[in-house]
Curated annotation (Swiss-Prot):
It comes from Haloferax volcanii (strain ATCC 29605 / DSM 3757 / JCM 8879 / NBRC 14742 / NCIMB 2012 / VKM B-1768 / DS2) (Halobacterium volcanii). One of its GO terms (molecular function) is large ribosomal subunit rRNA binding. Residues 305-341 have a biased composition (Acidic residues). Forms part of the ribosomal stalk, playing a central role in the interaction of the ribosome with GTP-bound translation factors. GO terms for biological process: cytoplasmic translation; ribosomal large subunit assembly. GO terms for cellular component: cytosolic large ribosomal subunit. CDD domains: Ribosomal_P0_L10e (cd05795). Residues 291-348 are annotated as: Disordered. Keywords: Ribonucleoprotein, Ribosomal protein, RNA-binding, rRNA-binding. It comes from the Archaea. This is Large ribosomal subunit protein uL10. Pfam families: Ribosomal_L10, RL10P_insert.
């Protein structure tokens, strides 16, 4: 240890040293560690949130300077979280993945009234309709903050949706009073995830705010496209081998029937085909004495039936191939869902 490090250690009070050590232990105890904003959350509500997270995540509050020192001591990339250490913040640790953590924190947020001097988190709109307030000076207060309001049918009505404040603008005292009177709660109170570090990667909220259903559908679509490519390119994999084998079997059978190749697998079809051709030929011979006894009396009308039977045999082979392909496609769809589900399992 250098002299400067010794001096730095010596000037740090013992309680701070112990606090930093505890913070280091906290950071090293979880697979994912993030920084959450806690500004504006009442103490009682914060304690309630911590209880609700018990078992899935833990929240640790401390002085920002000590948190920064702990992040430096852990290193391993955790120091990247220092850029989010500003204002009223806390560390949050979980052994779950960052996506699940973000989803849980967002779901735990609750609507709350906004106070004068606060910044609007989004556009504030007073909706059209009956305010439920009796005629009086409140109609003027509504108009003063930019709402379209008038007295109608013995009540104060907002005649159209009125955007009274844009995102990022400061809330005036007049607007705060109007919103409180109307019971409009334009902000959400909860742990605001600023960033989370997991497995060497730093995630920000906009990267974690994904549509799970859309993401699942994208994965299923990708699996389906990959399966089709594998089948069409005749590139066997564990997932597509059954489809390729069924396809090859069906095509081989069609070739065998067309080329009259003798094989036990399709001998019945060949015999049926030959019989139909023989009967068609016999029907066109006028001298019945030249025919074997079993073929005498075959009428010319049976010719079409014979040709139809031959055509039916070929169509049956094609149908077998199509049925096999449909069965394999159905199996592929089931496999796609399972593969996509497995791919999402670790994230959601």
């Amino acid at each position: 240890m250098s002299e400067s490090e010794v001096r730095q250690t010596e000037v740090i009070p013992q309680w701070k040293r112990e606090e930093v050590d505890e913070l280091v232990d906290f950071i090293e105890s979880y697979e994912s560690v993030g920084v959450v904003g806690v500004a504006g959350i009442p103490s009682r509500q914060l304690q309630s949130m911590r209880r609700e997270l018990h078992g899935s995540a833990a929240v640790r509050m401390s002085r920002n300077t000590l948190v920064n020192r702990a992040l430096d001591e852990v290193n391993d990339g955790f120091e990247e979280l220092k850029e989010y250490i500003a204002g009223q913040v806390a560390l949050i640790g979980t052994n779950d993945n960052p996506f699940a953590l973000f989803k849980e924190l967002e779901a735990s947020k609750t609507p709350a009234p906004i106070n004068a001097g606060e910044v609007a988190p989004n556009d504030i709109v007073i909706p059209e309709g009956d305010t439920g307030v009796d005629p009086g000076p409140f109609v003027g207060e509504l108009q003063q903050v930019g709402a379209s309001a008038r007295i109608m049918d013995g009540s104060i009505m907002v005649t159209e949706d009125s955007n009274v404040l844009s995102e990022g603008e400061e809330v005036s005292e007049e607007l705060a009073n109007v919103l409180a009177e109307l019971g409009i709660e334009p902000k959400e109170v909860g742990l605001d995830l600023r960033g989370v570090f997991s497995e060497g990667v730093l995630f920000e909220p906009d990267e974690l705010a994904i549509d799970v259903d859309e993401y699942r559908a994208d994965i299923q679509s990708a699996v389906s496209a990959a399966t089709n490519l594998s089948v069409n390119a005749v590139y066997p994999t564990a997932q597509t081998a059954p489809t390729l084998i069924a396809k090859a079997t069906s095509e081989a059978k069609a070739v065998g029937l067309f080329a009259n190749i003798e094989s036990p697998d399709f001998m019945p079809e060949l015999i049926s085909k030959a019989d139909a051709q023989l009967r068609a030929l016999a029907a066109n011979i006028d001298d019945e004495e030249a025919l074997p006894e079993e073929l005498r009396g075959v009428s010319a009308a049976d010719t079409g039936a014979a040709e139809e039977e031959e055509s039916t045999d070929e169509e049956a082979a094609d149908a077998d191939q199509a049925d096999a392909a449909e069965d394999d496609d159905a199996a592929d769809d089931d496999g796609d869902d399972e593969d996509a589900g497995d791919a999402l399992g670790s994230l959601f």
